[in-house]
Amino acid sequence: MIKRALREVHTCSKLRHQNVISVLGITTEFDGTVSIVSHWMENGNAHDYVQNTTINPGPLMLGIAQGLQYLHTRQGGAVFHGDLKGSNVLISDSGQAVLADFDLSLLVDSTFSLTTSGRAGYTLHWTAPEILEGGVGGQKSAEADVWSFGMTLLELFTRKIPFHPFTLHAVAYRVSLGRTPDRPSDEDTCSRLTDEWWTTCVKCWNFDPLLRPRITDVLQTIRKIQQ
């Protein structure tokens, strides 16, 4: 199992894209757990970054979409992020979004563990319903990443986690009923989260994974919005 985990990290170390973190290696120096070594990002993560009200989240979403498209369509085999959310997107020195903190399932399932503050508490808000339900459909996939992308879009435009202010149990219950987040109605958020952006969210939240847009299509939509 550990050898398989190391192979997965090795695969991630081969990823080369401006919107995907460069994996330099792994270490067990911190509490004996397996941690990924990567370049330090001075600007922190996207969730904290957009708390600065002068930041336009649109270009960040463009970068996230570009990173996901690279992962989902790479020639060496598709890679699924599996844990996309604002706190797992870092901001480079030039202000670009960089996908980080992949959910490396082999590492998580091994005797080692990946430690991420708040992972168990908040990931549910971004997770596709088929993942929450488990079973055959409960695997990482491009479709599940697209659902999480829509939630991350909402997060960065509202500067709040999806389904705010509902508790974990309330979120799980709402999703089980086929309900997605309500559209914000406050003037400040609406000035950023226009009809085009909101429609993009809604399409990503289709409860049928096969009816969600591909990230390539989402990227094309965002490029048109950004023009």
Language-model segment annotations:
Residues 5, 9-10:
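Regulatory alphaC helix of protein kinase catalytic domains
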Residues 31-45:
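Conserved short submotifs of the Hanks-type protein kinase catalytic core
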Residues 22-34:
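Short beta-strand micro-motifs within the conserved protein kinase catalytic domain, predominantly
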Residues 205-217:
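A conserved short helix/loop substructure at the end of the activation segment
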Residues 145:
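Conserved catalytic-loop aspartate of Hanks-type protein kinases
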Residues 87-125, 134:
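Activation segment/activation loop of eukaryotic-type protein kinase catalytic domains
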Residues 72, 76-91:
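Catalytic-loop of the protein kinase fold
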